[in-house]
């Protein structure tokens, strides 16, 4: 995905949070974000790593993975996580872009296409609102403004599947947002990656409950 971002010539990169919890290479991931020079907002999974209370119930297995991740990150990595802010506000091409994880109010909020009232409320003070959390690529215009959810880089899945049958797809999702004096437009990207290489990284990582995680990826 990073190669695709570089190929299309994106001028500004923003990460909408949930960066490393559950992944096989947490320290390497933070290093890659640093190399990209991108602003990163705080997601609920990042907050969980930092010991904050989050809305979604957690399991003993998730807590074991959290402890392992914290160990992998070390003090310097945890310091980087603590620097993540709930929102990032950018002024680009005369457009106000507000970036968050769930909503500008909370990383736990869920914004969906059918939630017109919530979307109307959050778009009041932005030309573009970018949010994640649901792992679902979608966009909607609200007057002259634009909401965009870029999907998920590492845990993309088919939202038509029952929750108990979810399998992650081997694609990295992101969105390109084009801005000029006329407004904003969006293009969704889905970049295939080598799932066998990912499986090897998970097996080699020492991550707790790796076998259960491997079963979540589509074959």
Question: Where are the language model's segments positioned?
Answer:
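Divalent metal-coordination and catalytic microenvironments
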Residues: 13-14, 18, 33, 43, ...
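Acidic, His/Gly-rich catalytic cores of divalent-metal-dependent hydrolytic chemistry
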Residues: 142-219
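Active-site environment of divalent metal-dependent phosphoester hydrolases
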Residues: 21-24, 45-50, 105-107, 130-141, ...
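Anionic-ligand binding region
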Residues: 114-156, 162
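Active-site-proximal segments of metal-dependent phosphoesterases and phosphodiesterases across multiple
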Residues: 57-64, 93-124, 158, 200
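Short acidic-hydrophobic surface loop/beta-edge motif
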Residues: 86-94, 140-142, 177
């Amino acid at each position: 995905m990073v190669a695709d971002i570089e190929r299309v010539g994106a001028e500004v990169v923003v990460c909408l949070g949930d960066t490393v919890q559950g992944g096989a290479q947490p320290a390497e991931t933070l290093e890659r974000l640093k190399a990209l020079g991108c602003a990163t907002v705080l997601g609920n999974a990042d907050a969980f790593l930092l010991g904050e209370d989050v809305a979604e119930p957690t399991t003993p297995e998730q807590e074991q993975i959290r402890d392992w991740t914290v160990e992998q990150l070390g003090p310097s990595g945890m310091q980087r996580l603590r620097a993540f802010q709930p929102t990032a506000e950018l002024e680009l091409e005369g457009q106000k872009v507000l970036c968050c994880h769930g909503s500008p109010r909370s990383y736990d909020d869920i914004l969906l296409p059918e939630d017109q009232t919530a979307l109307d409320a959050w778009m009041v003070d932005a030309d573009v609102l970018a949010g994640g959390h649901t792992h679902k690529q979608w966009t909607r215009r609200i007057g002259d403004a634009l909401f965009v959810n870029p999907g998920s880089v590492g845990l993309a899945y088919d939202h038509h599947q029952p929750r108990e049958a979810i399998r992650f797809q081997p694609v990295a999702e992101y969105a390109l947002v084009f801005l000029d004096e006329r407004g904003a437009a969006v293009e969704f990207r889905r970049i295939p990656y080598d799932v066998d290489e990912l499986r090897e990284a998970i097996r080699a990582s020492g991550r707790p409950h790796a076998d259960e995680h491997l079963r979540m990826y589509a074959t």
